[in-house]
């Protein structure tokens, strides 16, 4: 492969190309119009029944108005029913649209992926969407191709074209002798959306956006919220259970009301039809109230809120299930570099095996040509690395030595390359050097040293001693070696280095400090019952020292808690299962070691989250319950992951666990509140049906209760901010039912207490004279009991006061809407809601009297906190 100097496009040429060929953005497919989506809400079977009942109610009201000459007030209730239906469906629709917009962010992020291009003779990074036709693009292992292009250079370039052709491995070349005449696309073409599995290259963009092959078959990558997560499945089962219960109650109400009619009324067809219609409407309304249609909305809102806020804490959720699963995580398998450390590589020391100038020049050239990274030196005082951080650190070291790495690259010509891989743990490059070919090798010192002429025992001891010193300081090390090749000598065969008589040049020690926030984040995870395991390519000594610095490795730990990748691979499956829970560190790990570790932990019932940033991490990311890719990781790793940690930091992973646990807790709070109201509403209406008096709650009143219980409660409780208190709990059992024992006891006791109070009040009012005023009192008492209970639901499992609402602006806003809404309905609802205005003194009695719900809850929480 020849070495080329590319100029690339100028700024003016970029603008001209974009105007001529368009931007590198795919046009989204046409969406369903909002009005159609809104109308779909009215095709719900229960809403249809309610609409039919409402229409029949209007018919009867017309008969009463036109034939019986009753006043226009007969229309208030049916009109109220329709307003309540519109309000409930409308609010649900608005929040569904809002949630969709929250999720749409994931589809935009892909257009912001950084791409390395050459423009104005300078290598720079630009967002994928800014790539234009004619751009010179550099591609490397793990990259996703930004636009269709013609290869100008290619080194061991293997592409995954499965997204277009189904071919997982497709060899690419610029050598016409290697062209495949039967290939679906030309061998020297790379295509948008395909991924570099191995090697690197340079291409010139031929087509962007919709003009690419990918664009021609594009369907917008929408979030698939039809996929049922374990939480969704649990909620579906719960919803069906409640629905069946509510149907049974509704059936009993119809039976009871019909019996009461024949026992207490003279038969009259018009009266009977009106009575039956009212009965059916009450029964259907009770079903509407009882059926938890707010559950899906609570989950959607909670996910949308969590995903948006998690993005602010550097967690980009790519797949829905990941939010809830992070909350159940029991083990986190993490990389070291960039996740536990700052990924700010700098050369701390260079140990030369030979101290002459020729040796130094060989090392300089080795570093310069054996690298795919480049430096952006537009700011001479602070060069910016484009590419691999480790290789960048070496180039910056050359820069500080006043050595221009580009001079070595232009003076030599690369003849052959063997790219770095985690399996071989080294890379090799053959270049022309004067009249000779020189092989330069860079990689793990012990692996490179094995291929060197090392007859000198003292040299071996010196190497081991120096490596130990560096490892005890948690430095990562690289070894450098070379060989001048004879004219006919072959050193790379079938992707393997076949030379073992190299000359060792030096060890370079690179420091990468631990992130300041990581020790505390690791402690939080350990306190939360989550095991942390480091899986790294570094030596055992380096990994152990990093483990000590972050608080994972303690003085009591021994060799049972650490293992090398080779030793781990040699264990039988049974031995792995016996030892895997004790392991804290796997050093010199390879990608398949990480995958095997994850599978072994899963076989023991653990919920595993795993980090990865490279292409070879994809298998482990896919098999884990939650795959966590790094923000600067490869596109292949991100594609396989569920969450992208934008800042790469372990502390962000800890925050993702907190969000996952809080999300689950918020949904539990919503269920707790809703089922408590369900129990009270069903028992009160059922009791009223068999008393032969007026029904305690009218249809419009129950629809207002439904609006509070479903829509408003979902908005208030599903979007509560996360609490660090959840990190003091142990991980929940992922298979456990969402209603735990404490919740069930709370629902039964509180719901039962409310029912007793409301039935006693109803019995008293019914026998004392059930007037419109008494109905208004009763309706307000019912709502205010639920109002105060919402505060208790918010405080559920926090151990804190329900009045501690700092930071809960959404909750307070909804509480205000419910309170003001109840006052307005009672004051101005009139015959539409079957209410009349209440005296101020009665408002004071009701508000203070029903608040006992809150004070009893506060007392119980106070006692529990003191225990």
Report each predicted region and the residues it spans.
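Long hydrophobic segments that form regular secondary structure
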Residues: 762-770
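Conserved cytosolic headpiece of P-type ATPases
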Residues: 1-731, 738-739, 752, 763-764, ...
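Generic alpha-helical transmembrane segments
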Residues: 709, 754-755, 776-791
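Membrane-water interface at loop-to-transmembrane-helix junctions
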Residues: 732-753, 770-777
């Amino acid at each position: 492969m020849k070495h080329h100097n590319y100029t690339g496009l100028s700024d003016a040429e970029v603008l001209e190309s974009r105007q001529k060929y368009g931007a590198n953005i795919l046009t989204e497919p046409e969406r369903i119009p909002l009005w159609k989506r809104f109308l779909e809400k009215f095709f719900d079977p229960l809403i249809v029944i309610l609409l039919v009942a409402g229409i029949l109610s209007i018919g009867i009201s017309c008969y009463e108005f036109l034939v019986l000459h009753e006043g226009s007030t007969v229309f208030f209730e049916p009109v109220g029913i329709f307003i309540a239906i519109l309000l409930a469906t409308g609010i649900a629709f608005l929040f569904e649209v809002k949630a969709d917009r929250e999720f749409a962010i994931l589809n935009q992020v892909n257009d912001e992926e950084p791409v390395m291009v050459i423009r104005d003779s300078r290598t720079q990074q630009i967002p994928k969407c800014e790539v234009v036709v004619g751009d010179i693009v550099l591609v490397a292992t793990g990259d996703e191709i930004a636009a269709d292009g013609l290869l100008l250079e290619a080194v061991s370039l293997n592409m995954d074209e499965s997204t277009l052709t189904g071919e997982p491995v497709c060899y690419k070349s610029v050598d016409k002798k290697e062209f495949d005449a039967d290939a679906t696309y030309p061998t020297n073409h790379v295509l948008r959306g395909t991924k570099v599995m191995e090697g690197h290259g340079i291409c010139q963009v031929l087509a962007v956006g919709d003009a690419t092959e990918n664009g021609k078959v594009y369907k917008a990558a929408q979030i698939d919220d039809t996929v049922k997560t374990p939480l969704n499945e649990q909620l579906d089962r719960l919803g069906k259970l409640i629905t069946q219960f509510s149907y049974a109650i509704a059936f009993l109400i119809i039976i009871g009301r019909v019996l009461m009619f024949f026992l207490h009324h003279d038969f009259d067809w018009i009266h009977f039809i009106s009575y039956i219609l009212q009965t059916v409407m009450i029964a259907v309304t009770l079903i509407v109230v009882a059926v938890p249609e707010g559950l899906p909305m609570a989950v959607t809102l909670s996910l949308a809120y969590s995903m948006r806020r998690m993005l602010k804490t550097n967690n980009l959720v790519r797949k829905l299930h990941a939010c809830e699963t992070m909350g159940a995580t029991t083990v986190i398998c993490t990389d070291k570099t960039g996740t536990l450390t700052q990924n700010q590589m700098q050369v701390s020391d260079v140990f030369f095996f030979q101290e002459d100038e020729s040796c130094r020049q060989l090392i300089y050239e080795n570093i310069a040509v054996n690298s795919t990274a480049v430096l952006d030196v537009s700011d001479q005082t602070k060069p910016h690395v484009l590419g691999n951080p480790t290789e960048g650190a070496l180039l910056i070291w050359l820069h500080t030595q006043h050595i221009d790495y580009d001079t070595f690259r232009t003076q030599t010509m690369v003849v052959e390359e063997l790219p770095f891989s985690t399996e071989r743990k080294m890379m090799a490059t053959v270049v022309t050097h004067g009249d000779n070919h020189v092989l330069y090798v860079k990689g793990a010192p012990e692996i490179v040293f094995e291929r060197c002429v090392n007859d000198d025992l003292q040299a071996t001891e010196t190497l081991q001693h120096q490596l130990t010193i560096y490892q005890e300081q948690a430095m990562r090390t690289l070894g450098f070696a070379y060989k001048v090749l004879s004219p006919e000598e072959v050193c790379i065969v079938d992707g393997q280095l076949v030379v073992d008589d190299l000359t060792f040049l030096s060890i370079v020690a690179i420091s990468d400090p631990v992130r300041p926030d990581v020790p505390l984040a690791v402690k939080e995870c350990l306190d939360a019952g989550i095991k942390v395991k480091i899986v790294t390519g570094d030596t055992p000594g380096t990994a152990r020292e990093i483990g000590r610095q972050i608080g994972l490795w303690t003085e009591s730990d021994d060799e049972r808690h650490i293992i090398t990748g080779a030793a781990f691979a040699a264990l039988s499956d049974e031995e792995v299962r016996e030892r895997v829970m004790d392991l804290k560190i796997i050093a010199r790990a390879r990608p398949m070691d990480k995958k095997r570790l994850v599978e072994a932990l899963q076989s023991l019932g653990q919920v595993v989250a795993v980090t990865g940033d490279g292409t070879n991490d994809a298998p482990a990311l896919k098999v884990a319950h939650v795959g966590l890719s790094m923000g600067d990781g490869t596109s292949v790793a991100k594609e396989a992951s569920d969450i992208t940690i934008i800042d790469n930091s372990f502390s962000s992973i800890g925050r993702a666990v907190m969000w996952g646990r809080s999300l689950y807790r918020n949904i539990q709070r919503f269920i707790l509140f809703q089922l408590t109201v369900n129990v009270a509403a069903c028992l009160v209406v059922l009791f009223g049906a068999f008393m032969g008096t007026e029904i305690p709650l009218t249809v419009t009143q129950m629809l207002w209760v439904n609006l509070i219980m479903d829509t408003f409660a979902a908005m208030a409780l599903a979007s509560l901010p996360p609490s660090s208190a959840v990190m003091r709990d142990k991980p929940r059992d992922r298979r456990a039912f969402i209603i735990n024992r404490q919740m069930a006891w709370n629902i039964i006791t509180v719901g039962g207490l409310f029912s007793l109070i409301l039935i006693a009040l109803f019995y008293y009012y019914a026998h004392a004279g059930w007037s419109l005023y008494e109905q208004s009192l009763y309706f307000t008492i019912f709502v205010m009991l639920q109002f105060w209970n919402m505060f208790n639901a918010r405080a559920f499992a926090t151990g804190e006061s329900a009045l501690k609402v700092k930071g809960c602006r959404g909750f307070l806003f909804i509480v205000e809407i419910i309170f003001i809404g109840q006052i307005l309905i009672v004051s101005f609802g009139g015959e539409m809601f079957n209410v009349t205005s209440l005296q101020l003194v009665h408002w004071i009695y009701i508000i203070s009297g029903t608040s006992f719900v809150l004070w009893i809850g506060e007392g119980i929480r106070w006692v529990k906190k003191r225990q």
